């Protein structure tokens, strides 16, 4: 279920403050954040934000196509290693 239109999109206030300060100074630094639920705003375009995936911070360059999505969508939390491979031993027993 999506968020109510009446409430508006959520952005972590500290993250938004850092972005606005960097835009005012015309800086481009990597910003670390744990706020995966924050919505990407147009002010964030062109910045690199390191989003926490549970183990490390994944750097994500924000482009125009990402506006409106959540930061967590671009930092996967699970890595799929694949199912067990077929070996000679497992196929010979059948």
UniProtKB/Swiss-Prot annotation:
Gene3D superfamilies: 30s Ribosomal Protein S19, Chain A. The keyword Cell membrane does not apply. GO terms for molecular function: rRNA binding; structural constituent of ribosome. SUPFAM superfamilies: Ribosomal protein S19 (SSF54570). The keyword RNA-binding applies. GO terms for cellular component: cytoplasm; small ribosomal subunit. Transmembrane segments: none annotated. InterPro entries: Ribosomal_uS19, Ribosomal_uS19_bac-type, Ribosomal_uS19_CS, Ribosomal_uS19_SF. GO terms for biological process: ribosomal small subunit assembly; translation. PROSITE patterns: RIBOSOMAL_S19 (PS00323). Keywords: Ribonucleoprotein, Ribosomal protein, RNA-binding, rRNA-binding. Signal peptide: none annotated. Protein S19 forms a complex with S13 that binds strongly to the 16S ribosomal RNA. Belongs to the universal ribosomal protein uS19 family. This is Small ribosomal subunit protein uS19. It comes from Acetivibrio thermocellus (strain ATCC 27405 / DSM 1237 / JCM 9322 / NBRC 103400 / NCIMB 10682 / NRRL B-4536 / VPI 7372). The gene is rpsS.
């Amino acid at each position: 279920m999506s968020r109510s239109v009446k409430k508006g999109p959520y952005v972590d206030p500290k993250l938004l403050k850092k972005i606005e300060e960097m835009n005012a100074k015309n800086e481009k630094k990597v910003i670390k954040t744990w706020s995966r639920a924050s919505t990407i705003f147009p002010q964030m375009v062109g910045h690199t934000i390191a989003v926490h995936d549970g183990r490390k911070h994944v750097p994500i360059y924000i482009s125009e196509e990402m506006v409106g999505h959540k930061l967590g969508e671009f930092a996967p939390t699970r890595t799929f290693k694949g199912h067990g491979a077929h070996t000679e031993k497992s196929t010979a027993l059948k």
